[in-house]
């Protein structure tokens, strides 16, 4: 038998051996991607609640396998193989397949590229300030920032907090909710409050306290440990309680979710608000936006550089394409801003404890590992029209890059499993096909050509081994796939002055190998768990261990897939049976419930000027006892853990001065003065020593009356004359933006000492006028400090007769020595 390589040049033999190995890797990747995608489609078909889901699962499966099968021969004939092999292919077949591949790839790469170009022509890219006028307490909407914290490094947490309060945004319009996932007073908690100027000489600390840090209000809370989602849920309950009355008068409250290790850019907040509220001609119906998350590191390496390139390309290219097609498909928890009035309508679905509804690993990957995508799917169904869930390319933040290869692989495995499960759920949702047809079509086609990037490496190898000349390669394919993307990355680097992203060809060559390893590792480990069963040491839920505790145990052990999700529902049923609750725990829906269709929307404003919320928020907390609202067993419900802590974990925040002695209060005031002076010096430095150009014109009595605002017809207390407006608003002078902070605080403090016993209510205009997004309440927060006596009276009132409740409430208000309006606990 003759030698098959007889007559072959040596370089062709070496090239063929190397290419053979790469082709085997590419074929393995091709097969695993098809197998994983089809497995998810089968799971969706089995779990489907509606016939349209099953029908779409069958159609998507047929088209997906068909397109993938076509690309197998294309991959073979496109590769620059030695001439001894190429001559075996029929010439007509080779030409036809190559032209089909060229136009298919050209369309799938060029059309999204044009969407990206259009986005940056019509929207601004970069960290430049977009708001032309100086924002003040009147013109700037209120922003509440939710930052959950769990065992974070104190220095990292302080940097994140400083990045928020140092933003170019009126401090009086910033309210940070720093929530610790754990109610113990530990070293991290004490170090944090000490940084904010709180003395560490107190005997005890309330569960929720208010401090002022660099002129911004910060509410520091400790909640029972239950995970990030539970911590955010408890924080939302607190926000909804504090701002309940404010939302009845205004629709200019926004909520920003960030992580405790994120560093906000200086103009991040105001650029978010510009796109959602303040831009010229804004219809003010934007519901959710995400920004640009970049990576930062103290020590550079190849891994960190590739992550930075991937972050920039994935967000500024892929997410802007999605944004141009109607909606982004992932709102990351690290940087997402939502319109609060619309979000509270979705809260009970957003914060539902999906871990207890997991039947298998598919549900666990969809709802836990890929919760950001799952929750974005909820919002896409909840929105009434396209272009309400968008990308803000001028709002930036930084997060720490993963430093080790082991951590990176586990992170990407988590991302991959969350991506593929939610991607299949989106492709089989008929509502998305009708509302976002172009977006879903592009997502589907991109999934069909996924895992073909290894071909470019083979082309480069052909040139390096001189097996082929450049003229023998598919130059058009290379020019489109690499050239267009590199051109865009060059523009990004020049615009952002981030020149290392010009190294995009490095990512283009190396990333296919990293992505290959992420996919193979993720599918094999998940497949081993699916078909081989859980390991003996896998974390399981039972009567003593909740689903969340089992998940945390697996993560602590270093493998978040080493769990037994099949035990989650039985464990939850045991818990509910022990608690006397008869509700049966069922598995979660494969698609968002039909109940939320169109629910993610702004409430209507009534003829009297008030916004009609209709008690739509599950977590709206009344001033007295709040009963639990039963939820649908499949759509959403509170976990047993949340149910036991819901009534004792949310407290009205107390001003920290109210729990201090005279000496501690004096020290705290000195610390506050030092912080405020530092804040003013930083403001002057940022404006080159010049005061802000904007002016704050306080409303006079006549102006308020012309606008339609009136006082409640409450009789004045003895020895006091009635005023047309609350004293905190009745400032008959105009001051600069910075000075208004000082004058507003001092005026409110002086007025509170005169008006301790009574608070007035500012009535909204009675005319039905267009929403302006501004209100005199935007300048200040009105607060009633909740003392122990208040809480006791409140609890007693909730169990007393309804006829006695108003009298008890007024008596508590009149007898409270700490009842003041300075700072903003209870919104009026």
UniProtKB/Swiss-Prot annotation:
InterPro entries assigned: Chitin_synth, Nucleotide-diphossugar_trans
Main location: membrane
Biased composition (Low complexity): 740-752, 813-822
Residues the record marks as carrying a glycan: 615, 818
GO annotation (BP), single: chitin biosynthetic process
Subcellular compartments: Membrane
GO molecular function, one term: chitin synthase activity
Keywords assigned by UniProt, alphabetized: Glycoprotein, Glycosyltransferase, Membrane, Transferase, Transmembrane, Transmembrane helix, Virulence
Similarity section: Belongs to the chitin synthase family. Class VII subfamily.
Catalytic activity: [(1->4)-N-acetyl-beta-D-glucosaminyl](n) + UDP-N-acetyl-alpha-D-glucosamine = [(1->4)-N-acetyl-beta-D-glucosaminyl](n+1) + UDP + H(+)
Any Pfam family: Chitin_synth_2
Transmembrane spans: 17-37, 57-77, 95-115, 444-464, 473-493, 501-521
Region (Disordered): 740-780, 793-828
Any single GO CC term annotated in Swiss-Prot or TrEMBL for this entry: membrane
PANTHER family with a match to the protein in the record: CHITIN SYNTHASE
Phenotype seen when the gene is deleted: Does not affect vegetative growth. Does not significantly changes in the chitin content in vegetative hyphae, nor in conidia. Abolishes the ability to form appressoria on artificial surfaces, except following the application of the exogenous inducers 1,16-hexadecanediol and cyclic adenosine monophosphate. The appressoria formed have a reduced chitin content and are smaller and misshapen. Also reduces the ability to enter rice plants, but does not affect growth in planta.
Membrane-topology annotation of the record: Multi-pass membrane protein
Protein name per UniProt: Chitin synthase 7
